[in-house]
Amino acid sequence: MRFRALILSLAACIIALGLSSSSFAQTKADTINKALVKTHATLSKRYNRVSHIDAQALSKMDEDSYIIFDVREKDEFEVSHIENSIWVDPSIDASSFNAQYSDQIGDKTLVLYCSVGVRSSRLAQKLEKTRPETETSPIYNLENGVFGWHNESRPLVSETASTHYVHPYNRLWGRMVNRKNLRRYEPEEK
């Protein structure tokens, strides 16, 4: 029930995108970014055990010091993803995740992302709850997810090359992507 309340609250933020139109004060991008900030605030309260990292801080980290996981559906990942990210099924449980990826992670910082942070925060919290006390490497959710990354014009890749497209998840959530013409439900043709 609490998850449903979270989704309804986040949907209200998205719907507000279409309703707020101050002719002189806000651009569409400002409105979208404010919706992402509001969504992040809601997620931070809901998943209060999860630490977050923003795109700027992540881009300054040594690439060998972290491992990044994309916690979206496979079709979203195929359209685009952050370079070197590893796809993870959003429904994976913590023990399966640890069994499958613990050797790759080692002592590296773990970064998870999805569209805006719902699915990745959920997985990050599961991992935090079940991790042994001996493991001290940080687990982060990427603040504002791949939508925030994309809105800041940071690089994305597909299976074949770099791309400017991002999967919008659905029409409602996709309204948080600044450039409508760069939303795409299918990967680019090879």
Placement of each model-derived feature along the sequence:
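Short hydrophobic beta-strand that contains or immediately precedes a catalytic carboxylate
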Residues: 67-72
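Bacterial N-terminal signal peptides
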Residues: 9-20
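Gly/Ser/Thr-rich loops at beta-strand to alpha-helix junctions
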Residues: 115-120
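Bacterial N-terminal signal peptides that target proteins for export
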Residues: 1-10
